[in-house]
Each structure stands twice: as C-alpha cells, then as structure tokens.
Amino acid sequence: AMVEGNPDFSIDIESSNGWYFDAERFATTLTITGELYNRDVTAHILDSDVEWTRDTGNVTEDNAWAVAHAETGKSLPLTVNDLGPDYMNMTGCKFVARVLLRDGQNNYETMNYITF
C-alpha cells in the first residue's frame, strides 16, 4: 500500500500558557503531539516511550530532574522550580523530549526541544 506524506516521524511541543513568562509567575504544561505521514499519531505514542530531559548547564541538577520526571508521559507540567536553581543567571533552560513510536513493524524515534 502506498502511504502519502512525510515518512519521517516528528513531534511538536506545545505550551498551554504560551512561550513568554515573567519568571516569578512561570507555569505551563508542555504537551507532545506526533505526526507520521502527515497523520496525527499522538494516540499511538505510549507515555512510557516519552523521555523528558532538561539542560540548564548544571549536569547534576539536570540528571536529578530527569529522574524525578521519568514517568511524566506526553504532558509535562512545569513551574518556576523546574527551570533550575540558577535560572535567573542563565541564558536559558532547555527541555528536550525524546519519543519512540511503535507501529508493530517498525520503531520510529525522534526528538524536539524548547527553550525558556
């Protein structure tokens, strides 16, 4: 069968409260949507196949954060505490999502990130 559209698995990350915040009032939820062959495949992404990591430049803090958020799934609630202890002195805080899509025959893997 011929399947039309982009054969690359891709994800988008949306922010429930937009992208610009005052640091003191930072709160949002990041949500992943997936696309394969121009079709929404979000429902087929298992929460256990989503891995969130954070990059603040502080490897120890970022690793601890990743362990604490290992079971998060497709939606990641964030508060100012998730930006790391040195956020006000940093150039940004990056949140990275790595996602695996299993279709029964193939596994597709992709990643995307956003920076606050």
What are the language-model segments listed below?
Residues 1-116:
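Surface-exposed receptor/substrate recognition regions of extracellular proteins
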